[in-house]
């Protein structure tokens, strides 16, 4: 079951329910829970900040059975995702592994989900935008 790690956390931690091998590349990792998100709410799956900066914690997969797996950090990232209102199925967390395959131990917190209220504006096609003259984007105002 997802939990807040501290009382004022914005979201709930998502746990891997059992030992899971993470292969190189993108992979959907089942979390073992189903959700029913009500109308007007969405869930935003986010990486945990510690994994984002330090790498994802897991165990090496030894080439030989007599070698013991070693705990280390791997270059793997959680890809952000949205759980739409009305969704009624199991949550998966997408991991992009840029490293060697590794095993995440069952019970490891790998991501978090934050729920938000949302509104959908009515979109209209137009040839002219009125209001602020604000263009550019992507850093057009500089850094200082």
Predicted ranges, named:
Residues 1-144:
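DUTPase catalytic domain/fold
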């Amino acid at each position: 079951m997802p939990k807040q790690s501290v009382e004022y956390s914005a979201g709930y931690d998502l746990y891997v329910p059992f030992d899971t091998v993470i292969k190189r590349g993108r992979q959907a990792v089942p979390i073992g829970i189903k959700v029913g998100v009500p109308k007007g709410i969405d869930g935003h799956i986010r990486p945990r900040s510690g994994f984002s900066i330090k790498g994802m914690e897991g165990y090496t997969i030894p080439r030989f059975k007599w070698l013991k797996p070693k705990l280390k950090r791997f270059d793997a990232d959680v890809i952000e995702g949205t759980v739409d209102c009305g969704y009624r199925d199991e949550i998966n967390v997408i991991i992009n592994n840029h490293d060697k395959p590794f095993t995440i131990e069952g019970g490891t917190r790998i991501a978090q989900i934050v729920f938000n209220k949302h509104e959908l504006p009515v979109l209209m096609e137009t040839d002219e935008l009125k209001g602020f003259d604000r263009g550019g984007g992507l850093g057009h105002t500089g850094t200082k």
